[in-house]
Amino acid sequence: MLRREKGFTLIELLIVIAIIGILAAIAIPMYKTQTIKAKLTEVTNGMSNVASAVAAYMQEGNGWPTANSQDLVQSSLGVSTKALSRIGSLGVNNGVITAIISANTIDPTVDNKTLVMVPTSNTDGSITWTWSSSDMPPAYVPKR
């Protein structure tokens, strides 16, 4: 009577390992990108707080504010610097908000890079904000 072997052949095991390798090669870079985007959310939320303060300042009839340091942003616009912990440098010039992300806080891909919010006054009195960056990879610049 022939005894039948149970288990996987070497080819089957190699195919499974290859499939796992392909999935890992796709998933790991996507995970890294999403992790960076999640950490950047803290920066964009802090900048959005400043944008709200800039919009309120403008709509009170004061014109576009200018504050060239985080301390001035906090004192003149009333924005807490706790929300700006990952931002190394922050300034507002005629309503345009410019932030430089702190070194060694998120990832070398975005650390020390500049993120800019540019306001546009609409005819109905609302303000539309546009995000941009000259040195940050486009995948990390907010779309909204």
Predicted regions located by residue number:
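Short alpha-helix boundary/capping motifs
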Residues: 1-3, 59-60
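N-terminal single-pass transmembrane signal-anchor helix
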Residues: 2-35, 42, 46, 50
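Context-gated lysine
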Residues: 6, 32, 37-39, 82, ...
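Hydrophobic transmembrane signal anchors and adjacent membrane-proximal interface regions, especially
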Residues: 23, 39, 48, 108-109, ...
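Conserved hydrophobic/amphipathic alpha-helical signal-anchor segments
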Residues: 33-75
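Periplasmic/extracellular, small/polar-rich flexible segments of pilin-like filament-forming proteins
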Residues: 59-144
